């Protein structure tokens, strides 16, 4: 191995190890909330659950993932779930889910907008479909806080004119 490669490896390895330790999917069941927050930092949101607490780590608006870390009543990690995928988005129940349920499952949206033909907000989430196909989920929430419609579109390419993200 050349001297340059050894120097590169010496600097790169610690960076890779730090990056891996800050990934929610690398956490082991049973970890305490304090250990989780020491590793990942403060969550972007905290939600009460019937059986414990959900710590939410969102990569929105720039990223395409939201990790839900569910803790039991004793504050121990039970489950890590990357919730922004088509399977979970398609579980949204039109005319039943509320703004709070969307927030608890998917966190804060990347964008909140209003459109002319809908009386309410449109929450837009960035997510990836299999094989890294970038998509947007537009969740229409009326003024009473009820989900009325979900529309899926392709995310504009970075070089598209007028790209908002």
Predicted segments — roles?
Residues 1-12:
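Bacterial N-terminal signal peptides that target proteins for export
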Residues 16-19:
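C-terminal motif of bacterial Sec signal peptides marking the signal peptidase cleavage site
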Residues 21-165:
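Residues within mature, well-folded domains
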């Amino acid at each position: 191995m050349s001297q340059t490669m050894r120097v590169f490896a010496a600097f790169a390895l610690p960076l890779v190890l730090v990056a891996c330790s800050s990934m929610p999917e690398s956490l082991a069941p049973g970890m305490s909330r304090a250990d989780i927050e020491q590793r990942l930092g403060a969550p972007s949101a905290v939600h009460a659950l019937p059986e414990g607490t959900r710590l939410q780590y969102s990569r929105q608006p720039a990223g395409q993932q939201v990790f839900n870390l569910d803790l039991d009543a004793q504050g121990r990690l039970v489950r890590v779930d990357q919730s922004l995928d088509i399977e979970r988005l398609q579980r949204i129940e039109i005319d039943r889910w509320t703004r709070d349920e969307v927030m608890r499952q998917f966190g804060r949206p990347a964008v909140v907008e209003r459109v002319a033909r809908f009386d309410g907000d449109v929450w837009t989430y960035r997510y990836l479909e299999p094989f890294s196909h970038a998509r947007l989920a537009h969740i229409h929430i009326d003024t009473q806080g009820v989900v009325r419609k979900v529309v899926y579109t392709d995310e504009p390419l970075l070089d598209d004119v007028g790209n908002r993200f």
